Structure formats: C-alpha cells, structure tokens
UniProtKB/Swiss-Prot annotation:
NCBIfam families: gcvT (TIGR00528), PRK00389.1 (NF001567). The keyword Transmembrane does not apply. This is Aminomethyltransferase. The glycine cleavage system catalyzes the degradation of glycine. The gene is gcvT.
Amino acid sequence: MKKTPLYEAHLRLGARMVDFAGYLLPLQYTSIVEEHLAVRRAVGVFDVSHMGEFLVRGKEALAFLQWATANDAGKLKVGRAQYSMLPNERGGVVDDIYLYRLGEEEYLMVVNAANIAKDLAHLQALAKGFRVELEDASERTALLALQGPKAASLLQGLTDLDLSQKRKNDVFPARVAGRPARLARTGYTGEDGFELFLAPEDAEPVFLALVEAGAKPAGLGARDSLRLEAGFPLYGHELTEETNPLCTPWAWVVKKEKAFLGKEAMLAQACRERLVGLVLEGGIPREGYRVLSGGRPVGRVTSGGYSPLLQRGIALAYVEEGAEGPFQVEVRGRAVPAALSPLPFVPLK
C-alpha cells in the first residue's frame, strides 16, 4: 500500500484511513457531512497526491495531444487548462483527464490514480508515431486541492501573487507559505478553488499552513459527495472503456471538427441509454441499484449517496434512451420514487 507525503500529518489530525487505488488516504477526519458543508460554505483542503501526473514535451506535443485527446488542445494558450478525455479506438473512454499547457511545447496531464499504469501504456503506444517525450512525474509530485468560496481569500494570505487576476482554468507558478508551487484554478467540487502541485517535501508544510490559516481538512468521503452534487463523473462509474461520451452530459468535451483516436467508431454508435440525475423521496441510492419505470428495470445507478445540501439521496444513473419515467430506485427491495433532476444538482461556482 502506497502512502502520500501527508500520511503522518493525516494520522496526527485523526483521519480515518482507507485504501483507495492502492493508496492509504483519509476517508474523513470528523464527519463527511461536516467536511462537505465546510467546502460548500467556507474552505476545505484535500490531499489528492494519489492522482497521476504526466509531462508531455516536444515539437509534436500538440499534434500528439490532438490525436490522443477528445477536446481541442489547440485552443489552450500557455497558462491555461481544460477538461478532456482519452478515447480508445472503439469510441470508449480510457480515462477522463485535466490538461494544462505549461509552455509552448510542454503540457501537464493529470489522470486518475487507478488508471496511471493503463494510461501511461496507452499514451506510450500512441506516442510512437510522434516526436514527443512522455514522462511519468506522479511519484515526484504532491497535489493538494483547496476548495470553497473562501479558498481565494485564504490562499491570498499565504502568497504574494495577486490571485484576483487569475481566472478559472488558469495555471501559474507561485510561492505558497514560502514554498515553490504550481497553482491551477481548478477543482472537482463545483466550488471555486485551487489545486497546488508541489514537490513531495513541500507538501506537509504547505498543507499544515493551509489548515492553520483556517482550511478544514477533508477526505475522500466529502470529495465524492461534493462531486456527486456537482454532477461530475467518476471514472469507472459514469465513464468506462465502453462508454460513448457522446451519450453523456459531457459530450461537449468531444470536438468533432478535429481528428482523434476512435472518432469514427464514436460517431457511428447510436445512443441506447442516457445519463440522468435522480433525487429520491427516501433512502440512499448506491452504485448498482436498479432504476425502475412502469414496474420494470430501465437502468442502473452508477453513483449514489446523500446530498448534505438537498438533504436527500441523489444518484447519477443510466436509463434506456426511451424511458421517460416516472422513475423509482430499488433500495433494499423497496421501489422508492425518484424525481428527475437537471445536472448539476446544486449550482456550480
């Protein structure tokens, strides 16, 4: 089991540790709901050092990324970032990623922890036709996520850089609590916030400085409930190697006007199901629970849980393309009425 550079700090803060993608990470410190609401109302800090980081460099870095990713990497100026996906040749999704342009011929790709080895092998195979260098920087990169409406004001107290000039999806160098960092105004919670890329030896002092300044430490439990309220996908749940992204709410990522791996296969597939948001009248939905309509199964929950803001059980679910409802979710043998909800479940900041 791997440990992040913050492992000892988590234990000192009383974290309940769990195995996630081969890493020992905090599930929670106090309560998931308390940590969730701290991020929605003030500011929380997450250790996301388990995420993977790849550096892509070279004269053909952009050409390679245009082929390897579904979004238009050509629109990225230096110092900007975008959400994207790695398609496979069948039109499915190898992983969903964040891509940052660091220089004219240098990019940073952040990938999901469980997919680091798979993504690296996939990209290395694709890179053989391009003059490009691919480096796995995951082990020498620590990553913190400072999220919430008070994230900017808290972080401003620890850096000399004027953060008010930084927009969503900006990426830039800075010093935080006296340590060198790369900051990005990105996140996975639906709130304003920053992600801090650090050398492993700088992670603990910066993390503790953020906590001392008022950021509430938050674990994987709150990270998942926050992204669920925000209607964001989790790889392996809403997105898989078999998922056609054109049949999801994230079809906007796919730029059909450019060439990319698997484009023809993706465009040729008819959508047999669609992803919907559901708010239950009672009970807590979980992954794999059946969605019913007219007494018959028409879909399945891919992610479910309790929404601290709505104070209801909420779910992301795939249902048959023609299914219109009314829907129920089968919770422990009981068909619980579930109302269709637009996504996100809560307003994004």
